[in-house]
Amino acid sequence: MAHISTRKFIKWGDEPAGENTDTLVLTTAGKHFVDIRIYLPTSPDEPSIPSLTPLPISRLEWGFAGTASPTPAVYSSLPGRETEIEKPSHTVWTHWVDNKTTDEVQDEGDMYPQPNRETMEYGAMENPDTGKVEKYQECWVDLEIAKVDGEEEFRSWVLRTEDEEAGVRGVLARVGVFIQGVLRRGEDISVGRWMWDAERGWQPVVEIGKALVPRGVFSQEEFVLGQRLVASDGLKWVCVESFSWK
């Protein structure tokens, strides 16, 4: 099923745990994901999040999107120990578009459910502060999925755009009242996060980049699988997933 998660903290190796980003991950029912990590402001002069004006690219720690491949956990079969994990669930995330690289890289981690809708993730990936692959621990908090006003069902969808010759790849995903997007046009990177407002419709939480994802692409809230549309900037998008549930 679809889910929304925000990061509570990350811990690298023996360093203390901390969090210097506003990180939100949308994962759709079909296991497409969009992961956007925005540096928190370090001075009163820097805009906070949500921001009504676009932020500089320097505020983007990481923005990537692709598909997740989870393997379920294996629990003990011994009587009285059925809740003990013998082998944790494991997820591999394949990056189809990434602000850091044009390669389809992967990262992976072991997941351990915790109380209060939290999950601990253990794995290894590149530390942005050192440039080296290091072991990490991340604490994720699952957010409750909400409905857009007037909709009777929960909804998720995914739009993609690609132009190999122009170096274009982009993903827009909606889960409930959140939409996130990552767009690469050559060397230009754009990311966006929007949230539904009952009075004003889809409103920006954060937008970064020269080639901003046009909000007009998702002016309609429902898409049909295979549906094609052209944005105001000429990019051609196609719906690769559309799902609703009660």
Enumerate the language-model features and the residues they cover.
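Lipid interaction determinants
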Residues: 1-63, 73-246
